[in-house]
Amino acid sequence: MRIIRLHHLMLTVWAMACVQLLFGQATVGTLNLTSEANQDYVLFSPNVSESTYLIDKCGRLIHQWETEGRPGMMAYFMDNGDLLRTRVHQTGQFIGGGIGGIIERFDWDGNLVWNDTIASFSHHHHHDIAVLPNGNILAILWEKWFTEDAIARGQLPELASEEVWVTRIVELLPMTGSGSEVVWSWSPWEHLIQDTDPALPHYGDPADYPQRFDVNFQAISASGGSGLGQEA
């Protein structure tokens, strides 16, 4: 109990010192600070900026990276001090919230040490990524399919859209310098159920297969087409 109280007292003193700092000089980003906050650093990449900032809870700038292009939806600080971030890359094929398209890694000095473009006519990275314990990267993509693809999987023609955006999650093995190899992937497109045509694959009663995705369940994508999607 004494240790807990002492720790709380130290946090309170630290927070008070930060408050004095906030009034004494300009800081980067800190608007509110309480004794309940931990002492971890904060990494953020403003949506309209090409800079990424590492600050302490007092708002003091610890480090800054200058990069090219608007950031995607995330930035991560690696154990060795590298910055891993996503970047917006438009191809004109996919337009939606959370769009990314490029994953890049910078060392502490701001040198680009690795990047990968995951954006084409048929697929596009969006939203978050995750670094696995083995160093590989999980990324979430949109895949583009068309009316005939959906109908061939049992979707009713009256429900079929011109484009169908389907989620795919991929595990990427980064190559030296740039690029990656897909070593694993998963998509709901491979786990469908439909009850419209017994001659087509994945026929059955959706109620009997709750682990599968009903191809006739409608979700509207940002483009106005239908989609089987997931945002991280």
PLM features: what roles do these ranges have?
Residues 24-232:
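Histidine-/acidic-rich catalytic cores in large beta-rich domains
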Residues 1-6:
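N-terminal secretory signal peptides that target proteins for export/translocation
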